[in-house]
Amino acid sequence: MSFSSKVKGEICRYIDISKEEALAEISAIMKVSGTLAFSGSGLSFKMTTENPASARLIFTLLKDHFNIHSKLMVKKSNSLKKNNIYMVVISEEMGVRGLLSDTGILKEIDGIMSLDYRIEEYIFKDEDIKRAYIRGAFIGGGSISNPEKTYHLEFVTHSEEYAKDLSNLINTFSLNSKVIQRKNSFIVYIKEGEQIVDLLNVIGAHSSLLEIENIRIMKEMRNNVNRLVNCETANLSKTVNAAVRQVESIKLIQSQIGMQRLPDNLREIAELRLNYPDESLKELGEMLDPPVGKSGINHRLRKIEKIAEELRTSK
């Protein structure tokens, strides 16, 4: 099951809601996933989804809150996956005109009928109604990527004005959704992980948001471990390179002028470095009597490297 299906399955359990919330939710579903048809038998409206939980919710909301006994149809998709496609159909005799009027989709002005797919003003004025509307928009046209791979949540709509309205509604919850055009569709999307979690909280997908939070924590831990490993590897590489350079300098001094020409403190550490090329500066310092700190050992080895460099340039 995809993560989108999990989220939809979770939020489709919200059926014990007020009539106002149900109207907002059904309005969003209709505007995102619905098709209006005119025929000899009158008007009909069809909502299409590949998610069985979404189809059941639409059917239940219509029956429980609007006394509309819609028709539920199922057919096989033409795609390679051959998924079922669920269609909830409301005909003239089932009360489609009243529902279209209640949702603000069908309006009559001076005897002329017109379609309006904007989000009505009253939706913006109540927190619970806003949440129900966004929940409906996700049920009708939303999707979310697998959070193990990437963070991306989107709503597919077919009107630029509607997409902008939906984005504005989402952003009343201090989110930063944006709108882009993709072929003939207008996409409202969020890409930042924390914001996706916040939106899932808005629509009531609490189990799903906890799953994303756990994934985000694990990703962050893995990234931190990788950073530490990379840092340790880089430091180890620098240490090894420095030790190789020091041994080469000491061998040059030994062959050119002899170790006996070095001051006692430098000869002492030079001999230790030759005998223990893999030891750290701290470990070399602890071998001396009295012991010398890491910075003191580093200072002596730098002096040795300087002497070797002078020998190289004097050739």
Swiss-Prot record:
MF GO annotations: DNA binding; endonuclease activity
Domain of life assignment: Bacteria
Swiss-Prot/TrEMBL keywords: Cell cycle, Cell division, DNA-binding
DNA-binding region positions on the chain: 280-313
Pfam families in the cross-refs: HTH_WhiA, LAGLIDADG_WhiA, WhiA_N
A GO biological process held by the record: cell division
InterPro entries the record matches: Homing_endonucl, Intein_endonuc_central, Sporu_reg_WhiA_N_dom, Sporulation_regulator_WhiA, Sporulation_regulator_WhiA_C, WhiA_LAGLIDADG_dom
The protein's role, per its UniProt record: Involved in cell division and chromosome segregation.
Family: Belongs to the WhiA family.
Protein name: Probable cell division protein WhiA
